[in-house]
């Protein structure tokens, strides 16, 4: 039994986590290209 609140939190955290990883990877790539 998955609680709706827990399900909502997970569904909310997934995009935030993916966005954070994408931004971190982009910053590393940009920094590597600049050097």
Curated annotation (Swiss-Prot):
Domain of life: Eukaryota
Pfam short name (any one): PetG
GO CC annotation: cytochrome b6f complex; organellar chromatophore thylakoid membrane; plastid
Membrane topology, record value: Single-pass membrane protein
Main localisation: plastid
InterPro entries noted in UniProt: Cyt_6/f_cplx_su5, Cyt_6/f_cplx_su5_sf
Any one GO molecular-function label of the UniProt entry: electron transporter, transferring electrons within cytochrome b6/f complex of photosystem II activity
Keyword Lyase: no
GO biological process: cytochrome complex assembly; photosynthesis
Record field: transmembrane: 5-25
Localization per record: Plastid, Organellar chromatophore thylakoid membrane
Keywords linked to the UniProt accession: Electron transport, Membrane, Organellar chromatophore, Photosynthesis, Plastid, Thylakoid, Transmembrane, Transmembrane helix, Transport
Transmembrane found in the keyword field: yes
Family: Belongs to the PetG family.
Stated role: Component of the cytochrome b6-f complex, which mediates electron transfer between photosystem II (PSII) and photosystem I (PSI), cyclic electron flow around PSI, and state transitions. PetG is required for either the stability or assembly of the cytochrome b6-f complex.
Protein name as catalogued: Cytochrome b6-f complex subunit 5
Annotated organism of origin: Paulinella chromatophora
């Amino acid at each position: 039994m998955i609680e709706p609140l827990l399900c909502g939190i997970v569904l909310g955290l997934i995009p935030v986590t993916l966005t954070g990883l994408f931004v971190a990877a982009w910053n590393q790539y940009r920094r590597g290209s600049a050097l």
